[in-house]
């Protein structure tokens, strides 16, 4: 009863957080970057998977658990232009307190030449974002688990800097018989504590997300569906002022899409579709489509791969290597690399090898 009450309070908090915030501009948008190859390959949305992969856990803290204890994950992404970002993640489980994780994220936007209003050079400067995340997860029962993250955020752009805090809260359900996993996540609830400029507070990039995945029983497939921005219906960036709408060649009037077309476009902008194929125990292939990215980044004059992403992950004796690529626009295809180590598994293998060697010698 106590566990169900705790879960109910948590879900109510998620709903309230989503209801109480509205869309619009925000600060600290680097928090929404994908810091794991599996996340990138599956469309850069929330994923809900009950397995041994530690690389995505900081985005879904409810699945931080004992099976990932003593794991390290490193990520590097070659983004656009001079921009690169990286992260390092570690998790450990304490029997009574639960499972804890820590991650540091760094985004470097490169160096720039400063200019004054007269066009004179003022010297070079850099721009960087950093976030330190502390996560916690705990199983309430074999089927239910919860988790939370606390994020310390720092941004420095030339002489301007900002500091803020944000939290994530998540709850997950797992059915081992159906191989079904569900997660609800309230993400980036927080605010600036120190603003870039005086009296100009901006909100963090809040999102309310839901994800499900299911491993099919007789084929090596797992499908993923994730929903984002559940607190807001209209996802069209331009609204009625869209400068890319077609015009009638005779009257030069704007051709607005039908209400039905607008409805389904908005509906699918909230959904990411992903598929994992596991042809062998050590290999996973991923493919996904993000309709919102496609609509925002597509080129009208020709077909585009915008919104598609793909990748793979190798898992060999406690060592995971992952690669993913995501398409935004021609020439804008970030590459993401992941390396993850489970030190408990590596230690276990080392002990087994020593035992076999001793057995042969005796």
Protein language model annotation of sequence segments:
Residues 1-4, 142:
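Positively charged n-region of N-terminal signal peptides that target proteins for export
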Residues 4-16:
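Sec-dependent N-terminal signal peptides
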Residues 21-362:
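Subset of outer-membrane beta-barrel
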